[in-house]
């Protein structure tokens, strides 16, 4: 039963990932992406990593994929023109693909890491430790520096996205709150003697 479930989730994830790449409709591609995430979460459950599976569903399916779906549906993007512009980057994509395939071939071949690399490998967590506790011990004890660096990279990416999307238009009227707070009421207020039946 476990073998059948593994092949079911694995084939579903591979097919969904392939459909994401070749899909012509971006909305359909996002839906296939959600299926790929759910299949990967099922594989994590089979491996006994329920916490990681739940994180995958909540973060990727519940936030990222839904955000992609709303962006694709709400933005008026000419995908035909976009594909035409992306065609010029096809040679670079092929080079990167060949490099990745070569790296995968080296990783799955008879290559063995050096003794120094083996000494840096973390010792396995005790089997008696629960899944969530073991993950916390690995992240916050053995790889705490890498974890903090990953958070710093995400922070820089968030700040960069805000800076890139922030636009200042000169024709838009804005309030200077600090200037309004420090202004002198005697200079900003003016009393007028309005006569009856007349305006200013």
UniProtKB/Swiss-Prot annotation:
Signal peptide: none
EC number: 7.1.1.-
Keywords: Cell inner membrane, Cell membrane, Membrane, NAD, Quinone, Translocase, Transmembrane, Transmembrane helix, Ubiquinone
Residues that span the membrane, as ranges: 2-22, 26-46, 51-71, 90-110, 144-164
Top-level class of the enzyme under EC nomenclature: translocase
Source superkingdom: Bacteria
Subcellular locations according to the entry: Cell inner membrane
Membrane topology: Multi-pass membrane protein
Catalytic activity: a quinone + NADH + 5 H(+)(in) = a quinol + NAD(+) + 4 H(+)(out)
GO cellular component, one term: plasma membrane
Major subcellular site: membrane
The keyword Cell membrane appears for this protein: yes
Family: Belongs to the complex I subunit 6 family.
Oligomeric and partner information: NDH-1 is composed of at least 14 different subunits, Nqo1 to Nqo14. The complex has a L-shaped structure, with the hydrophobic arm (subunits Nqo7, Nqo8, Nqo10 to Nqo14) embedded in the inner membrane and the hydrophilic peripheral arm (subunits Nqo1 to Nqo6, Nqo9) protruding into the bacterial cytoplasm. The hydrophilic domain contains all the redox centers.
Function per UniProt: NDH-1 shuttles electrons from NADH, via FMN and iron-sulfur (Fe-S) centers, to quinones in the respiratory chain. The immediate electron acceptor for the enzyme in this species is believed to be ubiquinone. Couples the redox reaction to proton translocation (for every two electrons transferred, four hydrogen ions are translocated across the cytoplasmic membrane), and thus conserves the redox energy in a proton gradient.
Name of this protein: NADH-quinone oxidoreductase chain 10
Species this protein is from: Paracoccus denitrificans
